[in-house]
Amino acid sequence: MRRKMKLWRRVSGAIKDKLSLITATDEKFTAAVIKATSHNDVSMDIENVQFIYRYIQSNPSSFKPIIRAVSLRVEHTRNWTVALKCLMLLHGLFFSGIMTVDSIGRLPFDLSGFGRRKSRFSRTGRFNIFVRAYFMFLDERSILYYNKNMIRLEIIVKMQRIVDSLMRIKPIGETPLVIEAMEYVISEVVLINGHICRGFAGFLSDVQSNMLEISSAEADLAMNIVAKSLSQREKLFKYFEFCRGFGVTNAQETSNILRITESQMIVLDKLLHIAPELDWKAAKVTPVTAADMVDLVTSEERSNTPSDFLTF
């Protein structure tokens, strides 16, 4: 009986995808979006996903129409597979090097209540919870660089919050599509932690070289970042261990960990004592853009610490 139900769901999903393709006669990328986010719960259609990314790269003006096509796909489905694939498709844009994605702002759809009417103990209940957690992270990630006037430390604080959101996304069994989504999640954890490391190292370097004058509020913010990283680091290692237990292959502990040197610790300690004396001055803080955050350390530092966690 179960096998028949599973077969029926697959046939039903294939029919829905076919009907959507028939009506998608306006743009060729619309068909690619439908194929990339099909009802097939095994894996993403990488061929069509890559086509969409290449299409945006070569036709930047297609970015918004493609986002609209994905939004329509989300709004017309109650299927967790389709919803998750739409989120993964958008998430992949952040890895693709398409700078336009940083201007997306809040996601143009809302999955925070996806499947809430169903019991968490229903057949799809746990998958609906997974979709909601993934959406909450991605909605926060999409506005990371939206405010161009944020200072470096404010961006780092937002990044730490995003890491918290990522750790709320937990693998469910060994469902292939969920494991694939978890690999996206782990890649994001590593990427964001790399930005945190380089951003904070760049901040300390500027302070040490007297290139940056900070206020006492910013000194407090820096110390809060340190405290948060200390507590977050332990949670991250446990999270990675948990994910490995479900077969998430890229959830490996990093062997080389970026450490704050003794001289940098001295700088941190001095911040709280020196900063109040600088409050009367205008802080010489330059807003940091998305591109700046990726390139805040020298090439030598980047090669020595590719994507590691910040520890103290």
Swiss-Prot record:
GO terms for cellular component: clathrin-coated pit; clathrin-coated vesicle; Golgi apparatus. It is found in: Membrane, Clathrin-coated pit; Golgi apparatus; Cytoplasmic vesicle, Clathrin-coated vesicle. PROSITE patterns: ENTH. It comes from the Eukaryota. Its main location: membrane. Transmembrane segments: none annotated. Residues 21-152 form the ENTH domain. GO terms for biological process: clathrin coat assembly; clathrin-dependent endocytosis. Keywords: Coated pit, Cytoplasmic vesicle, Endocytosis, Golgi apparatus, Membrane. InterPro entries: ANTH_dom, ANTH_N_plant, AP180-like, ENTH, ENTH_VHS. GO terms for molecular function: phospholipid binding. PANTHER family: CLATHRIN ASSEMBLY PROTEIN (PTHR22951), ENTH DOMAIN-CONTAINING PROTEIN (PTHR22951:SF78). This is Putative clathrin assembly protein At2g01920. It comes from Arabidopsis thaliana (Mouse-ear cress). The lineage of its organism: Eukaryota, Viridiplantae, Streptophyta, Embryophyta, Tracheophyta.
